[in-house]
Every structure is written in structure tokens, then in C-alpha cells.
From Swiss-Prot:
PANTHER family in the cross-refs: PYRIDOXAL 5'-PHOSPHATE SYNTHASE SUBUNIT SNO, PYRIDOXAL 5'-PHOSPHATE SYNTHASE SUBUNIT SNO1-RELATED
Protein name stated in the entry: Pyridoxal 5'-phosphate synthase subunit PdxT
Pfam annotation, one family: SNO
Protein's gene: pdxT
Binding of L-glutamine, residues: G46, E47, S48, R103, I131, R132
Family that this chain belongs to: Belongs to the glutaminase PdxT/SNO family.
High-level lineage: Bacteria, Pseudomonadati, Acidobacteriota, Terriglobia, Terriglobales
Organism the protein comes from: Koribacter versatilis (strain Ellin345)
Length: 192
């Protein structure tokens, strides 16, 4: 199974390491044509506005086509990229996930945190690393909330798309990546 990790900027290598430990064949995606080689895509954390600049209009459109039709997983900035609506400030998202997300909603870098929260994945509580994290302010009717922080969704799934506002790749817990790989294998939303 070939999994792409968008490797333009951000913490793409941490995702690569987790995915390889779980047995995936990882492609570091740096060009739009590489999207044709993969079965699923991870969009890592980083800076969403930088992703937009580096992708350009044509690259963004190729990304949008991929994430709206194939299994995709975004963390932090990647979740922003997958969103239907982005605020603080407003910017475009791919619309692959019916969420409204607020950039940097949990504060500046100094307010980053490592917290433990309940999640509905098998195994119970999960350690979650937040770094200038976005907050999901609203979810559409087809979005399943898998974990929350202070009443706000932090891990969500809709069809073939999974998003986390935290960084599961920075912990030893691989459950979120395992779920994504299951989604890719199943070609859909998978099972918990």
C-alpha cells in the first residue's frame, strides 16, 4: 500500500516514520503528479498559508481533486487544508471535510500543550500534542467526532477523510495512523 505524505514543509518526516513502522510504503509527495502513485495522502502540520503558497493554484487544484476522492488524513495545518471553511484569517480549504476551523485558536507557540483526552478509538484516552493548533468550531451533519478537547472536536472523520487538530505523529500512540491505514485499505471510512 503506497501512502503519500505531502512533503513541502512541516513535520512530514515524523509521519513517514510512523507510517513505515506500521508497514506502509511511503512516497514523499513534492510534485502534483506524484499523487497518481499513491492510494492515500497525509497532509502534515506546518503552516497552512505556506502550503497554499508552495502549492500554487494548479497544485492546490490537484490536491483538492485527490482529497475529495481518495483517503486523506490531515493533522493541524493539514486539517485546515481539508476544511470547507477556514477563519482567523479566512483562507481557502479543499472542502474535503465539512468543518469550519479557526486557525491558531488555542493560542501562540508558548501556549502549545500536551494533553490527554478521551477518544472513541479502541484503547481509551490518547495523548495529544497541540502546537499553535486550530480549533474545529463547527462540524457538518456527516462528520463523525472521534475525540474532543474542552467540548470541541479534535479528531474527526467524514467518509474517506480523517483530520486531527493535534499531532499524533509526535507521540508513541499509533492508533490514529492505524485508523487511516485501515481507511485506505478499505477505500472508505473504515472501522474503528
Amino acid at each position: 500500500m503506497k501512502i503519500g505524505v505531502l512533503a513541502l514543509q512541516g513535520d512530514f518526516d515524523a509521519h513517514r516514520q510512523v507510517l513505515e513502522r506500521l508497514g506502509a510504503d511511503v512516497v514523499m509527495v513534492r510534485k502534483p503528479e506524484q499523487l497518481r502513485e499513491i492510494e492515500g495522502l497525509v497532509i502534515p502540520g506546518g503552516e497552512s498559508s505556506t502550503f497554499l503558497k508552495l502549492l500554487g493554484d494548479a497544485g492546490f487544484e490537484e490536491l483538492r481533486k485527490f482529497v475529495t476522492t481518495k483517503p486523506s488524513f490531515g493533522t493541524c495545518a493539514g486539517a485546515i487544508m481539508l476544511a470547507k471553511q477556514v477563519e482567523n484569517p479566512a483562507q481557502k480549504g479543499t472542502g474535503a471535510l465539512d468543518i469550519r476551523v479557526r486557525r491558531n485558536a488555542y493560542g501562540r507557540q508558548i501556549e502549545s500543550a500536551i494533553l490527554t483526552s478521551e477518544c472513541s478509538l479502541p484503547g481509551g484516552e490518547m495523548e495529544m500534542v497541540y502546537i499553535r493548533a486550530p480549533r474545529i468550531e463547527e462540524v457538518g451533519p456527516g462528520v463523525e467526532v472521534l475525540a474532543k478537547r474542552d467540548g470541541h472536536p479534535v479528531l474527526v472523520r467524514q467518509g474517506k477523510v480523517l483530520a486531527a487538530t493535534f499531532h499524533p505523529e509526535l507521540t508513541g500512540d499509533t492508533r490514529v495512523h492505524e485508523l487511516f491505514l485501515k481507511m485506505v485499505r478499505n477505500g472508505n471510512s473504515g472501522e474503528k
